[in-house]
Amino acid sequence: MTGYYSTHFPHISPPYVREATAHFARKGKHYLITSGTTGYLPNPSEIAVADTWHGPYTVLGNPHRNDQTQTSFHSQISSVFKVPGKKDLYIACADRWRPDKMELPYECYREIYERMFSEDPKEREAVRRMDLSEIADRNANTAEADYVWLPLRFEGDMVYIDWKDEWRIEDYE
């Protein structure tokens, strides 16, 4: 063991550290779609790209550009796969852990998570005194989760996930 280590995808603290990594490769590039750390409550996804499996990865931004809620369409990407027999069709599979909380604005709990992990002890203490019953998820019934499957769209290296009320695999080359 040596003192050497490498950092491939650094972020500061929750909710900005990343989880739920969905890796896929396309045209020689490696992609990661990740989620912030806000429990079962959704948050903006982030797409990153690298030339090799081990990076370094370059963050490209939120693939859900048209999602005004900043919640990845109220879901968390868990997997991406290329559809066999299709020219360039990739599908993102996402979990919608809390369909009962879709009306809860992201800004409400984003601020709480930022304060919860603040370097300022007064901010952390203020969160401990808050009534967090509206966002608490330790008793969430994830058996009620549902799913979102959407096709990916590519522009250069950037990946986009657009909302579609319905779509068919047959509509893609």
Task: Annotate each language-model stretch with its function.
Residues 1-173:
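Carbohydrate-active catalytic/glycan-binding domains of CAZyme proteins
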